[in-house]
Amino acid sequence: MWPSDVGIVALELIFPSQYVDQVDLEVYDNVSAGKYTVGLGQARMGFCTDREDINSLCLTVVSRLMERWSIPYSQIGRLEVGTETLLDKSKSVKTVLMQLFKDNTDIEGVDTVNACYGGTSALFNAISWVESSSWDGRYALVVAGDIAVYAKGSARPTGGAGAVAMLVGANAPLVFDRGVRSSHMQHAYDFYKPDLSSLYPTVDGKLSIQCYLSALDHCYQLYCSKIQKQLGEKFDIERLDAVLFHAPYCKLVQKSLARLVLNDFVRASEEERTTKYSSLEALKGVKLEDTYFDREVEKAVMTYSKNMFEEKTKPSLLLANQVGNMYTPSLYGGLVSLLVSKSAQELAGKRVALFSYGSGLASSMFSLRISSDASAKSSLQRLVSNLSHIKPQLDLRHKVSPEEFAQTMETREHNHHKAPYTPEGSIDVLFPGTWYLESVDSLYRRSYKQVPG
């Protein structure tokens, strides 16, 4: 018998203390007004100086979660990190995090890598561990973190950075639905990092969008099929209270929500198409695989789903809009955004679907139920209260000019694998409690310190 109500007990999320404004970036890049803000749906982009790397981000988010929630480090029995920001081809980020755990060395797990999907894989592994015969009663800790950077050009505004830590255990306020998880895995060269000496990926933008939408189709169809068997009745998007997506940029998320409506329309009965989907009648007979770049179809389903998007998905886009694409934490930044957008009473009892995508490609759709107990001392109320700092902290960030941002990117590009190396970035602008890179010695050994506070 597995433990009851396995899910997310606690959440912590961090983002860089500086950002560049996308309006300023449009002017600096000499592109049309609205290209980044309207076309991509992005407002601000967080970024790291050379003082922060994937190790420091993960050190910060883990120490913050443990302190805020007063969790003894001895209570962690599994720790797994999902990331695609690799500093070492052998040594895992998880092993770097072990310096926080002092005498507790009995901790399973290492790193999981596949583009933006690694955090989800780590989460699934954590759930499986808690539900397995290997579980020893302690918590599993899942960390997802990345620094998303692109070379100069049209993709650079879709960068971002951040990390999330999720404490997984029994009797959780966010409980994962069992038996409905669906996955789609496929070989594709849509986005990959074959040049190990470079910070930047190789990207086929059009193929990447096609792969994302195709994976979404497959996962949603399978998810609906599985949950219909459990419920014994038809299931569509209207049965979900919130739908969260991996967010490369916000406009793609809006298109993705509309894509689920298109899926529902395609598999609807003739009667439903006439009554429920009358405004989409012109789409009768369309094949999903022919519609990835069909502007007319896209416009029709986006118009139809506009109110649905506002209700079910837009509340999850705060961090995607204000920080950018955090890669592996992106989807879970959506979950945090949802949790800080409403009160515990408004969230109680809701079912949330999540779509995770990582290029190459790996994808899954799964769902969770939010506890119906929103009383003053409930685990849900505590979870929401312990995320109340997120919105105010976004406003405490330091705004940086596009020129300084470009110079920072150049510094990172030239020095990211240099040894010995002493970072140039200022420590003064970092948030209190932030871990930062102090130095890299001649043997590439990295040393870290923590900002007081």
Curated annotation (Swiss-Prot):
What is one GO biological process annotated to this record?
Answer: acetyl-CoA metabolic process
The question of whether Transferase is a record keyword is answered with yes
Active site residues according to the UniProt entry: E84 (proton donor/acceptor), C116 (acyl-thioester intermediate), H246 (proton donor/acceptor)
SUPFAM superfamilies referenced in this protein's UniProt entry, alphabetically? Thiolase-like (SSF53901)
Instruction: Tell me the enzyme class.
Output: transferase
**What pathway, per the record?**
Metabolic intermediate biosynthesis; (R)-mevalonate biosynthesis; (R)-mevalonate from acetyl-CoA: step 2/3
Q: Which keywords does the record carry?
A: Lipid biosynthesis, Lipid metabolism, Steroid biosynthesis, Steroid metabolism, Sterol biosynthesis, Sterol metabolism, Transferase
Its EC number(s): 2.3.3.10
- Which reaction is this enzyme known to catalyze? acetoacetyl-CoA + acetyl-CoA + H2O = (3S)-3-hydroxy-3-methylglutaryl-CoA + CoA + H(+)
UniProt key word Lipoprotein = no
**Source species, domain of life:** Eukaryota
Molecular function GO labels: hydroxymethylglutaryl-CoA synthase activity
The record's comment on protein family reads: Belongs to the thiolase-like superfamily. HMG-CoA synthase family.
NCBIfam families linked to this entry: HMG-CoA-S_euk
This protein's name: Hydroxymethylglutaryl-CoA synthase 1
Q: Give the organism the record lists.
A: Blattella germanica (German cockroach)
